[in-house]
Swiss-Prot record:
Pfam families hit by this protein: Moricin
Coiled-coil stretches: none
Listed GO biological process terms: defense response to Gram-negative bacterium; defense response to Gram-positive bacterium; innate immune response; response to bacterium
UniProt-recorded name of the protein: Moricin
Localization: Secreted
Organism expressing this protein natively: Manduca sexta
Amino acid sequence: MKLTSLFIFVIVALSLLFSSTDAAPGKIPVKAIKQAGKVIGKGLRAINIAGTTHDVVSFFRPKKKKH
């Protein structure tokens, strides 16, 4: 357990040393994030429509009798 915590501590220390501390908001691809959000939204809508269609069809379909 102590070896794992020591390893994590070393990795965190190295990442703090080698990472830049300045934020660069100009480098964030806002258009790509918006486009991905639209695609994900359309996918979720399609899943919702498919689920609703399945519910409606299963409601009106006659149920099979079990033996």
